[in-house]
Amino acid sequence: MRKFLALSLAALALGVQAQDQKKAFIEVPQWVKDIKLSGYGMVQYQGSDKEGAKENTFNLRLVRASAEARPHKDFYAKVQMQINGNTSEGSSAIRLVDLFGEWQKYKFLMVKAGQFKRPFTFENPMHPITQGFMSYSQNVSKLAGFSDRTGEQASNGRDIGLQLQGDLLPDASGRAWLHYQVGVFNGQGINVKDVDNRKDLIGGLWVMPLEGLRIGAFGWTGSRGTKQADGSVISTPKNRYAFSAEYAKDDWTLRSEYIHSQGYDVAHTKGDKADGLYALCIAPIIKKKLHVKARYDLYRDQKEWGTSKTFYEVGADYVFTKNLQLNIEYARVNERATKSNYNLVDVELDFRF
């Protein structure tokens, strides 16, 4: 009996060992090994002397974490979370900002589906750090879905939909002369299903005649649905276009964009037209290290000068490493609607991980 028990225990031990060895040899797919985890943080100080609304505060402008993967050689996927919520709006809710996959087999035709940046303006899809200033320009913020004039929830310029894009007419060096983007979206912003069952159509086309230079135009037509207490739905139209130009080469950046919008806000209190224009320059003092910058940033909430708000900005940034930089800006702000002029100072420490 003892011999039988000893043999049984030995057989069991060998079986467990064999299973452990088998588990040890289970291969993890290469695309899982290649998943890239990253993130960034933007710590901010702002002070202003605006009458009746003075400000002297530290803020977490953005904290985000993301994962990128290639589950297939021709397929790219990304998920990104915003961890800090919107402290400027008194919200601390964590939210999903990106979740999409893109088939990238051909440069002339790539197909993206999920939640991602709307293909409207040059500035909207830019990374908040490389965009270069204390915030996105007013016209992009109000007319591309950050704090949209239609009343849409803050969506960081994103929506849920399907997009085609590609590069055309490559030259001998492989540099494309033409780029297009066109997409169909819900029109509601992030993390929300369509409400009025209508879709937004957004597209852009730009030419790149010289290295670093691109000149483009964008169009957007659609609506935002709002469900009422009685169950009915109100559709707020959005008809917008933009003209854009940018030169970015040798650490210099020159960029300007004009956006025009036709369509009321949901309460019909702001008129049915708005527009805005910005022009900026970022110039290197020490290449890839120290830059000075200036921006003219105008937005007219009702396309009338009496509703204009203008930022005249100057600043500088110092890049300690590719993952750490310090930004300082001063702005003189003119608000015609309130007949006020005031000063604004912004300091940011930006880092990537």
Describe each region flagged by the PLM.
Residues 15-16, 86, 128, 335:
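Residues in and immediately flanking transmembrane alpha helices
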Residues 1-23:
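Cleavable N-terminal export/targeting peptides
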Residues 49-53, 72, 91, 100-104, ...:
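Outer-membrane beta-barrel pore domains
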Residues 22-24, 237-238:
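An N-terminal domain-start capping segment
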Residues 15-19, 78, 179, 258, ...:
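Intrinsically disordered, low-complexity regions enriched for glutamine and histidine
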Residues 23-187, 195-201, 206-215, 278-284, ...:
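Outer membrane beta-barrel
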